[in-house]
């Protein structure tokens, strides 16, 4: 499992997992050679333009696939992004899907969004994503994070968020939500 992380904040909470800060072939091979079945690649792509993000994710996908073929190991990507729903979504997941399918011949027929960051007070309850301020949970779309000039959004629920960010390519009514009790 190759986790691409768009910002260094989240990786501060991982334990006993390697976090690589480049995607050179030797580095990716190190990840594949580990005993762990998972490693992180810190892309810092939240600070990139869409063009820079596209270039980086295409490069990473190509290197990961090349190393996977050389080592005879299968792989899958996870795109880890901001717990307040900012970032290059859906661009990054679309690029990873396109490259993975082209490189492996396998089809990805779905995507899982799982916004949660306990340490930062980010929770999703009944399909609404919240940011904790003190003891109060505020819907993320009502916070300053949703007003971000680059990655802003107005959607109140996760299905609406998907529809908004995909510009209607995926309708809110077609999003399946699974709540934990």
Q: Which residues does each PLM region occupy?
A:
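Cap/lid and interdomain-hinge subdomains that line or gate substrate/regulatory clefts
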Residues: 1, 5, 12-15, 28, ...
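Alpha-helical scaffolding within the catalytic cores
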Residues: 21-28
């Amino acid at each position: 499992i190759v986790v691409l992380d768009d910002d260094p904040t989240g990786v501060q909470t991982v334990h006993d997992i390697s976090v690589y800060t480049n995607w050179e072939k030797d580095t990716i091979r190190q990840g594949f050679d580990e005993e762990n079945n998972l490693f992180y690649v810190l892309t810092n792509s939240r600070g990139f333009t869409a063009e820079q993000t596209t270039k980086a994710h295409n490069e990473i996908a190509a290197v990961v696939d090349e190393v996977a073929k050389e080592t005879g190991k299968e792989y899958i990507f996870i795109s880890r992004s901001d717990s307040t729903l900012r970032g290059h979504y859906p661009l990054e997941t679309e690029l990873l899907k396109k490259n993975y399918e082209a490189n492996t011949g396998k089809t990805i027929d779905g995507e899982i969004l799982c916004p949660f960051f306990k340490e930062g007070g980010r929770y999703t309850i009944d399909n609404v994503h919240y940011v904790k301020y003190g003891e109060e949970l505020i819907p993320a779309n009502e916070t300053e994070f949703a007003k971000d000039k680059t990655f802003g959004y107005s959607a109140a629920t996760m299905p609406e968020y998907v529809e908004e960010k995909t510009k209607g390519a995926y309708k809110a009514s077609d999003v399946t939500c699974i709540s934990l009790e």
